[in-house]
């Protein structure tokens, strides 16, 4: 494994939390959701075989918590077959360097995310002027310089398959980031959405703290392409998922999920797109 891997110089612990922090939820027999402060990671696998895959890598300084969560489900010294990234924002790759060094495993992402994960390019800066709550206002403090995980990173197969996750396929869901992906399993309609949509109003400090469940579009302060975001939500809603784990907020399932997604598609411009902000295209809103 490549030893020359690092975070951007602005990477730091962010003192944000929620009542869900540290909680594990078994969503399906082989799908687990663990909340790290204000973001979710997913662990996919059969605890009886100790084989699993980690989806996303949490907040900065959370490696020990993620390793402990994995070992709680899959046994002491267990390690995933791979890490799959829905995208590369700081709260989804916050522990990736330590996890790579600890587990020595490959990491997969969409090819359009690779420049942000190999030190070549920074994401557009978060927008603290966007319409929204306190978290949006402080988003300028969030780490944004590119990380470099070098040769440990591989692009996802072009055929839509997901390494070490048989039955799942990856779906390109851009808008929040250029190479954002979601993961879907047809046999039980299980969806790992990433930040394509979330189940908490992520720009509101109060709602993040309390984890009040309500469907929303992607986090406003980081989303740069609202037209693509809307199309991505429509694409996921058309799959008619029966259970969804999102990057932020509690898992959602059944009638609540289907009705909420229908509402989000129908009223996306009102629910998701902010009235103002530097990435808002007035022509589509």
Identify the residue ranges that each predicted region occupies.
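Binuclear metal-ion centers of metallo-dependent hydrolases, dominated by the metallo-beta-lactamase
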Residues: 249-285
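Active-site metal-binding motif and surrounding structural segment of the metallo-beta-lactamase
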Residues: 63-109, 113
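Metallo-beta-lactamase
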Residues: 5-14, 59-61, 113-174, 178-256
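Short hydrophobic/aromatic-enriched beta-strand-loop microsegments
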Residues: 104-111, 128-131, 192-194
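Residue-level marker for buried hydrophobic side chains located in beta-strands
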Residues: 53-55, 84, 107, 190-192, ...
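Conserved beta-strand hairpin/beta-sheet module of binuclear metal-dependent hydrolase folds
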Residues: 17-74, 182-194, 199
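Short, acidic/turn-prone active-site loops that include or flank metal/cofactor-
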Residues: 59, 111-114, 196-198, 268-270
């Amino acid at each position: 494994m490549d030893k020359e891997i690092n975070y951007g110089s602005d990477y730091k612990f962010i003192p944000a939390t929620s009542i869900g922090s540290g909680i594990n939820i078994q969503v399906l027999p082989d799908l687990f959701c663990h909340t790290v402060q204000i973001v979710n990671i997913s662990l996919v696998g059969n605890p009886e075989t100790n084989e699993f895959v980690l989806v996303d890598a949490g907040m900065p300084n959370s490696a020990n918590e993620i390793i402990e969560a994995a070992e709680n489900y899959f046994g002491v010294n267990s390690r995933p077959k791979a890490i799959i990234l829905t995208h590369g924002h700081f709260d989804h790759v916050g522990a990736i360097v330590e996890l790579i060094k600890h587990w020595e495993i490959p990491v997969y992402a969409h090819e359009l995310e690779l420049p942000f994960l190999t030190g070549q390019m920074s994401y557009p800066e978060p927008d603290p002027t966007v319409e929204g709550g306190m978290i949006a206002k402080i988003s300028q403090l969030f780490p944004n310089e590119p990380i470099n995980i070098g040769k440990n990173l591989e692009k996802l197969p072009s055929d839509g398959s997901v390494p070490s996750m048989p039955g799942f396929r990856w779906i390109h869901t851009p808008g929040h980031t250029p190479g954002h992906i979601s993961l879907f399993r047809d046999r039980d309609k299980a969806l790992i959405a990433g930040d394509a949509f979330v189940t908490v109003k992520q720009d509101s400090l109060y709602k993040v703290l309390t984890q009040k469940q309500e469907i929303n579009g992607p986090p406003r302060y980081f989303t740069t392409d609202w037209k693509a975001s809307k199309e991505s939500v429509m694409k996921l809603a058309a799959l008619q998922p029966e259970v969804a784990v999102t990057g932020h907020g509690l898992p959602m399932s059944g009638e609540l999920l289907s009705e909420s997604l229908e509402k989000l598609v129908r009223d996306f411009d009102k629910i998701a797109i902010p009235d103002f902000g530097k990435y808002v295209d007035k022509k589509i809103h």
